[in-house]
C-alpha cells in the first residue's frame, strides 16, 4: 500500500506527502479510542520513519514530511534517523516537530500523564538546540573527502564533539553520521 501510494503521488506530480504520527491512542473523544478505531483516524498507525524508507526507494521527486515528538525521545536518536532518511531520500525529508498532546502517549512511555505544557515546550527548545548542533556544528562542510588513495574517509580534525550540557540533555560527542544533502531537515 505505502509504496504504491508514494509512486502514484510521485507520478502525479505531488510535491510532498505529510505523515502525522502519535505515540498513543487518539482517545480525546469521550475518553476512549473507539471513534479513532472505527474510522481509522490515526489508528492503526505505523512508524513513519520506517515507511518513508520504503517509499523513498520507489520515488524520484516526492518529498516526505514526518511528525516526530520532541517530548519522549533523546534528541541524539532522531538526529541520526533524520540524517539517514535525508541520505536515503536525497534531500527530500522534512520534520514536523510536536510536543505531544495525548495522555495515552505519556502512559505508553512510562509516565502517569502528559508533562505540563510549558515543560514540554522548554524541553522541545533544548531538543531542537541539540539536533541543530549535531547537524550544523559537528561535521565541517569539507570533513568528508573519501580519499581512497590516502586511506582517508574523513578528516578527524573537522569532526567536532558538540559538548552540550543542558537542563534535560547531555550530549558530549559528535554526530555519528556524516552530513546529508540538507544537513538539517526542512
What is the predicted role of each segment?
Residues 1, 47, 70-80:
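Short, glycine/acidic-rich beta->alpha junctions
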Residues 1-58, 184-185:
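N-terminal beta1-alpha1-beta2 module of alpha/beta enzyme domains
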Residues 11, 57-60, 90, 136:
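Residues at helix-coil transition
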Residues 16-18, 54, 61-67, 90-96, ...:
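Structural preference for beta-strand elements that scaffold enzyme active sites
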Residues 18-25, 72, 98-101:
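Short, solvent-exposed turn/loop segments enriched in Gly/Ser/Thr/Pro and often Arg
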Residues 33-36, 63-66, 153-159:
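A generic short-segment signal for beta-strand/edge and adjacent turn/coil regions
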Residues 37-43, 63-75, 114-118:
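The substrate-binding groove and active-site-proximal loops of carbohydrate-active enzymes
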Residues 74-186:
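Internal, glycine-rich beta/alpha segment that forms the wall or movable "lid"
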Amino acid at each position: 500500500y505505502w509504496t504504491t501510494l508514494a509512486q502514484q503521488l510521485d507520478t502525479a506530480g505531488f510535491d510532498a506527502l505529510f505523515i502525522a504520527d502519535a505515540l498513543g491512542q487518539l482517545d480525546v473523544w469521550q475518553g476512549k479510542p473507539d471513534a479513532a478505531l472505527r474510522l481509522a483516524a490515526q489508528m492503526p498507525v505505523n512508524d513513519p520513519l520506517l515507511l518513508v524508507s520504503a517509499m523513498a526507494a520507489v520515488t524520484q521527486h516526492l518529498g516526505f514530511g514526518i511528525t516526530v515528538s520532541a517530548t519522549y525521545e533523546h534528541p541524539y536518536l532522531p538526529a541520526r534517523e533524520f540524517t539517514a532518511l535525508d541520505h536515503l531520500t536525497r534531500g527530500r525529508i522534512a520534520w514536523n516537530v510536536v510536543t505531544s498532546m495525548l495522555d495515552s502517549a505519556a502512559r505508553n512511555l512510562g509516565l502517569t500523564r502528559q508533562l505540563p505544557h510549558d515543560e514540554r515546550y522548554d524541553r522541545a527548545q533544548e531538543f531542537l538546540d541539540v539536533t541543530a548542533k549535531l547537524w550544523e556544528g559537528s561535521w565541517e562542510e569539507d570533513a568528508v573527502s573519501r580519499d581512497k588513495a590516502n586511506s582517508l574517509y574523513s578528516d578527524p580534525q573537522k569532526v567536532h564533539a558538540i559538548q552540550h550540557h543542558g537542563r534535560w540533555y547531555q550530549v558530549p560527542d559528535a554526530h555519528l553520521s556524516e552530513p546529508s544533502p540538507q544537513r538539517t531537515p526542512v
